[in-house]
C-alpha cells in the first residue's frame, strides 16, 4: 500500500476506511476526493483525503458504512479478556454467552457474522432418526459459539470423547468447554480454537449441526482460495462455504443441519448451494422467523443426509415448516423452480399450479429487454430540489409509481446529469416507451412511461427489444395482473423486485392479442381464479 506525503493510493484509503475500491472511485467521480497522477497511476491528494475525513465522514449517506467502521473503536480482544475473567467466577454460564454477544459491537458482529443460536431453535433443528445410534457416533459443530448445539448433542446421548467443536473466538471455546465440565464433570479435549474452513486435514463425522457465520467478510485472496478448495463458482458467502466444508467432513449417509439466512433459499447467488443440496436427501426445510434481536433477516433450517438423491423424481418428500404450517414437497418441486428456489412458504397445491404453468411453452424477459437502474445522485440533499428551478426537470421515485399513473412530481434535478454517481444510457430514459417499476416492494407495480421521464434508483425500468410479440402497455397490464403477483409471491417472496427474478417470470404471449384479457388468458392456461390471491388448476 502506497502513501506519499502529497498523495495516497486508492488501496490505502479503501483499507483504512474499510470500504470497497468502488466506493472510493464513486467519491472521486462525485468530486469528494481530488486525484493526482504519479508513475502513470491515479492517486488521491492527501490534503483532499484529510479534508474528506474531516468534513464529510458522518455527514453523508454515501459513506455511512465507512464512517461506522471508522468510529467503531471497540476492542474485541479486550472484550474477550473481560469475559474470560468472568468465566472463572460465573455460575450462570449459559447466560454469559448471551451477555457476551450483546456486548459485541455491531461492526464486529457484521464482519464476523456472529449470532448465537437460541436453544428453542437448536431443539427443533437438531433432531435425528429414531433408529440413529448415538453411542458410537461422532458429532461436530464447526462454529460452536456458546456451545448450544454441543450441549444438545450430549443431551441426546453422544459421548464427550466423540464431540468435536471449532471456533475462532477464544471466549466461545472457553465457554463451551466450561459448560461441558460444569454439567458432566469431564474435560472435552476436542473443542478447539481453529478455523474450520482452514483445517489441515478433513476429519469425518457422523453428524454436523451448526449455525455458520452469516455474511462474514473475506478478503479477495481468501475468496479465491475458497473457490478452488470447495470447487464453487459463485456461492462464496460464509454460509455456502461452511455448507461445503461440512459436506466434505461428513461420512456417507451422515446427517447435516444448518441454520441459515433466508436468502440461502431464494437469492440467485446461493443457487449453486441449493443445486448441490438437491443432489442429497433433504429431510427438512424450516422457517424460524426473525430470532436475532439485531437482525431483520429471517432464519431458516436445512437438514439433509449425505445420501445421493439418485433420481430427480425421487418420491421421498421433504418436510417444509413455514409459520404454523407443515407441507410435504418433492425434491423435484424445488429442482423444477427457476434457480432451484426453495419456496418453502408455498404449499403443495400452490406449487402444483406453478409446475403446471412452467410446463406450458412460454417466453421471459431474459434477453428480450434492455434493463436500466434509476439514477443514483450520490447525495439527494444536494442534488434534488423541492420545486422547479431554472435548468431543472422533474424526477420521480418508486413511491410515485402506481399501476396506471404517476404522482405529481415533488422532486426536481439539474438537466446536467454528469455529476450524478450513476446514470444509465440516456437512450433508455428517453425511449419512446419504457416500463418502470417499484424496486423496494413486495408487490409488482409497473407503469408504462411514454413521456421520457427520469426516475431515481428506488425505481428501475426496461425497454422491450424490437421484435417482442406484444406492446409495452399490454405487457404492463400482464405484469400487474393478479396471476403474475401470485407467481412472483409463491416463487420469490422478497421485498425487492430484482431484475433476475423478473427475467424468470413466465410470459404466455401466445395467448395475448392486442390487449391483455385476464379471463381469456386464464382459460388458455387451464387455470381457475379462486380470488385475487388464490389460483388452482382447472379440473
Question: Where are the predicted features?
Answer:
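Major-groove DNA-recognition helix of helix-turn-helix-type DNA-binding domains
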Residues: 18-42
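Class I S-adenosyl-L-methionine
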Residues: 2-3, 32, 43-182, 195, ...
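General small-molecule cofactor/ligand-binding pocket signal
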Residues: 36, 192, 286
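Polyanion-binding surface elements
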Residues: 1-23
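Signature of N6-adenine DNA methyltransferases within the class I
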Residues: 120-121, 144, 148-150, 160, ...
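Conserved SAM-binding strand-loop segment of SAM-dependent methyltransferases
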Residues: 185-196
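Polybasic, glycine- and aromatic-enriched phosphate-binding surface used to engage nucleic acids
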Residues: 21, 26, 353-539
